[in-house]
């Protein structure tokens, strides 16, 4: 495994713990593509015997699962339980949920809440439209911030100097793949106060993103996704109006005072 640096606060990283986390993240990223022992050992650059021992430990504790032959590995059910506990314990998510319901009721479109995680956005809550099939996101999914309304709304809250160097991954022909193109788009986001994703993350889907400025810089955002086929100029203006109102309601809602922790 490559050498690891120091953790935050000057505390030296525990290699065994880091290896375990890297393995779980690798399996989670593979989704429905199970991995073989040698694949995992090669990916993390650790001896096959060490990887086997780690896998067996995690299988016994429910963090990793294996098939009936014992040769394929995937993420286990305890990862789901931990993720659910994260959502249930987060005061921001709990506070935002009723307003997502209101926006969904008013618009009949898909509404999301997401949080910036490095260069990605993690989806924390979704209200699906009853008018069309599922779009690109579900709770727990991560997408690169540069290719969606949620991510661009949050990137616009930060200086362009923090943007990573390109080229960026493209999901569609409309995705920004250069730092310069993304920065130009973010300048427009700052001017208008919300982001627009016109088929940059998924063909046929337009998104409108609104950063929630209860933190500085904003860590969370909400968005509305709508099929191009349903989007008229009048419909677009209605979506923007409702989502602006929703953002204002969320930002002016008093924070929880029942001993909730303010996480960083």
Regions found by a protein language model. Name each.
Residues 256-264:
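Short, highly charged C-terminal tails/helix-capping segments
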Residues 28, 151, 155, 159, ...:
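Short amphipathic alpha-helical signal-transduction/dimerization elements
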Residues 106-111, 191-194:
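Short N-terminal helix-loop-first-beta-strand/juxtamembrane motif that initiates sensory/input modules
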Residues 175-247:
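Extended hydrophobic
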Residues 2-89, 248-253:
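N-terminal helix-turn-helix
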Residues 78-106, 134-135:
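Conserved segment of winged-helix/HTH DNA-binding domains
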Residues 131-203:
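Short, solvent-exposed recognition segments
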Residues 113-118, 126-127:
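Short hydrophobic alpha-helical segments used for membrane anchoring or interfacial signaling
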């Amino acid at each position: 495994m490559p050498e690891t640096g120091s953790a935050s606060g000057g505390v030296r990283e525990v290699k065994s713990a880091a290896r375990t986390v890297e393995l779980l993240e690798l399996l989670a990223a593979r989704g429905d593509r199970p991995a073989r022992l040698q694949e995992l050992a090669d990916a993390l650059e650790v001896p096959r015997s060490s990887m086997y021992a780690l896998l067996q430990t995690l299988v016994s504790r429910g963090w990793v699962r294996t098939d009936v032959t014992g040769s394929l590995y995937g993420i286990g059910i305890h990862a789901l339980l931990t993720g659910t506990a994260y959502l249930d314990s987060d005061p921001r998510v709990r506070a935002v949920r009723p307003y997502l319901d209101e926006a969904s009721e008013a618009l009949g479109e898909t509404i999301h809440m997401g949080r910036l995680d490095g260069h990605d956005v993690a989806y924390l809550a979704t209200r699906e439209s009853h008018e069309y099939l599922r779009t690109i996101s579900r709770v727990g999914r991560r997408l690169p911030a540069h290719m969606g309304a949620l991510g661009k709304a949050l990137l616009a809250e930060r200086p362009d100097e923090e943007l990573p160097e390109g080229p960026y991954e493209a999901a569609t022909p409309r995705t920004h793949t250069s730092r310069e193109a993304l920065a130009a788009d973010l300048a427009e986001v700052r001017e208008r106060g919300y982001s627009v994703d016109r088929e940059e993350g998924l063909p046929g889907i337009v998104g409108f993103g609104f950063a929630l400025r209860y933190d500085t810089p904003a860590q969370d955002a909400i968005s509305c996704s709508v099929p191009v086929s349903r989007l008229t100029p009048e419909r677009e203006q209605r979506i923007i109006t409702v989502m602006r109102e929703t953002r204002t309601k969320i930002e002016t809602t008093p924070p929880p005072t029942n001993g909730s922790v303010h996480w960083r």
